[in-house]
Amino acid sequence: MAIKPKYVKQLGTLLLEEYPQAFNTDFETNKESVETLTNVESKGVRNRIAGYITRKKGSNTPPSASA
């Protein structure tokens, strides 16, 4: 797993603080939200930010018990 660039973390964190209701654990909806809330033109950067937000939103769920 790669370390995300600083600009991805900064923008992702800013978006989560400003618009927490606009994001959830679904990558596709987060991708659309990033597109509407920012002026990012690059598809790759948009997807990286959406992926970062998706991981941050999903990290609040407890791990499933496996055994």
Curated annotation (Swiss-Prot):
GO annotation terms (biological process): translation
CC annotations in GO: cytosol; ribonucleoprotein complex; ribosome
Pfam families per the UniProt record, alphabetical: Ribosomal_S17e
Source species, domain of life: Archaea
Entry GO MF terms: structural constituent of ribosome
Keywords: Ribonucleoprotein, Ribosomal protein
Keyword Cytoplasm among record annotations: no
The keyword Ribosomal protein belongs to this UniProt entry's keyword annotation: yes
Classification via HAMAP family: Ribosomal_eS17 (MF_00511)
Family: Belongs to the eukaryotic ribosomal protein eS17 family.
Protein name: Small ribosomal subunit protein eS17
Organism: Haloquadratum walsbyi (strain DSM 16790 / HBSQ001)
Name of the gene: rps17e
